Design a protein with these regions (language model features):
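Catalytic phosphate/metal-binding cores of nucleic-acid and nucleotide-processing enzymes, i.e., regions
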Residues: 2-120
Length: 120
């Protein structure tokens, strides 16, 4: 596969913000989120909106696919940054053994969907 995943401070970057910024891409976070939701649905799964009252900073979506462990997904634009609270929540989930991904932009979403499709 053409991309490399990096584990940094308890969460996974499928790609760095610097790389995404260099590509000059620009897409709103809600558009990126729609691509993820539609792509997971096309694979027979669900990408539930994760809302947890009293727990600000939790990832945006919980992805559930047939026969696979859940994935917690935080979506950002190509130039987006995690807040300190998001970093804390991601670390908490990782400490519980959960698969947490931070996806920056449409290309990261496409790579994630390909990974899920092909079981990489």
């Amino acid at each position: 596969m053409a991309h490399m995943a990096h584990i940094i401070q308890g969460y996974i970057h499928v790609r760095t913000r610097a790389t995404a910024t260099q590509e000059g891409c620009s897409m709103l976070e809600r558009e990126i989120e729609k691509k993820l939701v539609d792509g997971i649905r096309n694979q027979g799964g669900r990408a539930y909106k994760f809302v947890s009252p009293g727990n600000d900073g939790v990832p945006d979506r919980i992805v559930i696919l047939p026969g696979k462990a859940p994935k917690f997904i935080e979506l950002k634009t190509e130039t987006g940054k995690l807040s300190n609270l998001q970093r804390v929540q991601i670390t908490r989930l990782k400490d519980l053994g959960q698969d947490v991904r931070v996806l920056y932009g449409l290309e990261d979403v496409k790579e994630f969907l390909e990974e899920m499709q092909h079981g990489i």
